Amino acid sequence: VTVSSHRLELLSPARDAAIAREAILHGADAVYIGGPGFGARHNASNSLKDIAELVPFAHRYGAKIFVTLNTILHDDELEPAQRLITDLYQTGVDALIVQDMGILELDIPPIELHASTQCDIRTVEKAKFLSDVGFTQIVLARELNLEQIRAIHQATDATIEFFIHGALCVAYSGQCYISHAQTGRSANRGDCSQACRLPYTLKDDQGRVVSYEKHLLSMKDNDQTANLGALIDAGVRSFKIEGRYKDMSYVKNITAHYRQMLDAIIEERGDLARASSGRTEHFFVPSTEKTFHRGSTDYFVNARKGDIGAFDSPKFIGLPVGEVLKVAKDHLDVAVTEPLANGDGLNVLIKREVVGFRANMVEKTGENQYRVWPNEMPADLHKIRPHHPLNRNLDHNWQQALTKTSSERRVAVDIELGGWQEQLILTLTSEEGVSITHTLDGQFDEANNAEKAMNNLKDGLAKLGQTLYYARDVQINLPGALFVPNSLLNQFRREAADMLDAARLASYQRGSRKPVADPAPVYPQTHLSFLANVYNQKAREFYHRYGVQLIDAAYEAHEEKGEVPVMITKHCLRFAFNLCPKQAKGNIKSWKATPMQLVNGDEVLTLKFDCRPCEMHVIGKIKNHILKMPLPGSVVASVSPDELLKTLPKRKG
């Protein structure tokens, strides 16, 4: 158990450096962001220069920057990845989040390593192995319950990180191959085609339709607001928000929401602290209901629930705001529970489909009543009857508040002024205990009005508005009240604040790679199937080093050509439609979890049910045209057809 075992880390996502800065200002203790490559999010990469500028910004608040390098790597990518890791280390980032074990075999600087959720950490054995092999922090599978989390926490000394909010992958992370099988875009390489958000028809083993054209693999969004205390007790110390594709207002809002929640718990309990410095003040009221979500679930943290899926629509409908009274040619009359504004996004559900429109103009027509003129009148609106429920998925005024400065974060500093007529001595001590002393020589006379002079000194020293500090305490220990001209005092204070900045950055300590345990750990299995995602020689060497004998290639290597589980998930469609043998009354033997089918257009997937661990396997086969494509990540794959043509030998004559 480390010294910091009482410190809680709120970890926010950032698509880019601008969002990362705002996440920190809104209260994140750490931010995870993609570097220039291998970041498992197609289109969310950032230059080394941007990351190098972000690092000191974060470190001034004691906040950390984690870079995601969590794709599986082709052999041709190992050298570029090794160079990139060296460059990232030089920018000063705090840690790398990785999936590919080959990275541990590369010749890289001693950067702290975190195991990505893509490593599929569900068991004590695997968690302990990863902790023993050099991972400081491990991101557990989102499907775990409190008991499983607690067991892993008790068995390892790694910091436990857990997803508390955002989109849920329906499959175990790292155990989903459907995107690659159908499109050649590998989820393990950050290019998921999101087959789970498509509509499917479910059929039983007799071919009978159980459910028609629903989003049967689409999960609601994760929201652990109600479970934070229980997760802390189970050993979670890093609370992760999903969303490296999400926009600025989402990250501001959700970060602020959890900052306030965690601060309240820290305040109440007394034995916990936040993992970085400063206090955060928000200039808006955070609401998880007002930015994009697909409904909320706490997934399996407490127990299996029947309502984890968002089958009707993966779209965002927002909050109920009232009902539609009447629809006219170019406007509608509505009764509301909340005031409306021009620019609001409103919607109704018609036969489970979301029919949405922007309010071009709204006019109050009475007590809680408005007339709304949409930008474009949806044709389907005329189908609805009076008193049809109305939702708002874009609250214009609330969103506007988020586009402005919506938060401030300041670090506490204690100020002490001492000295005598010939020299003033100013000491600034930050809340972390970093202290600097600055002196000002001169001939300072006794002031005529002692009380006024003392107040002037106090106020002048506490003026920290332009810095990231606030004065927690100001002490003046002078033999008498001295007169110091304001211009001199201001410059003196500004120089001292700059010195404190430099001293705090210099005293910042980043982590480093954890040494491998002695004796070296042994991997819990001796044979790895394609589910282990071993895609390069270095990853093979890693597993051989720790006792694995037989290693099958990753799915992306195109050696699994037949029917295999392209998704393994805790989400069970038998359970969702009350067809689970475990729930059946009467003679259990007569109930078998026979296979079912999911159909989307020409695409037919078989569902098999593994009832002991309570899992569903989605069985599919890689498409033939994908087998003909170059392997993802290989040099060949990055060459365009035009460039290939140029390599043909020139015709003579």
Residue ranges, per PLM feature:
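Surface-exposed amphipathic alpha-helical tracts and adjacent flexible/coil segments at the periphery
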Residues: 2-26, 30-33, 37-40, 54-55, ...
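Aromatic- and glycine-enriched glycan-recognition loops and surfaces
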Residues: 43-52
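Short, conserved active-site loop motifs that form the nucleotide-linked donor/cofactor pocket
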Residues: 94
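Short active-site loop/helix that positions an aromatic residue
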Residues: 102-109
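Residues at the C-termini of beta-strands that transition into short coil/loop
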Residues: 117
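Short, glycine/polar-rich helix-capping loops at beta-to-alpha or helix-loop-helix junctions
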Residues: 122-126
